Amino acid sequence: MDNMEPSMEDFVNDLGDGGKADPTAVIIAMERAALDRWGKGDPSGFIEIAAPDVVYFDPFIDRRLDGREALAAYYEGIRGKVSVSRYELVNPRVQLVGSAAVLTFNYVSYSGSEYASRWNCTEVYRRSQNGWEIIQTHWSYQYSKQ
């Protein structure tokens, strides 16, 4: 990202507009900004938007991770190891329920070849005094039907 783009803090604080931004647009922008960093080997974008009490599931770990500290420790083990040349955020949908929002999407990433890794993601965001924060993440891999 270049320096003209909003920072994570701008997103978490509703782009500095006093909370008037469309929550759907803000949440999808937050996710894209974190995924942009993820693809460059930097998981900090997700750590920065995770709530202190976040819970996390993915297919590469045996148990749920509880809390931002546990998530940060897990992500440190993969820092610098992820390289995504491009990705597609397919059919993102945000469903608002009070001060919570559920983001669902399919994620297709490419790592320097045309081989695609396909994922499903569900994230639950909570609106707090700090803005929107992720309180639950669940990633699952789409296995080939071949």
Labelled PLM ranges:
Residues 2-47, 55-146:
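A beta-strand edge to alpha-helix "cap/lid" segment located at domain peripheries
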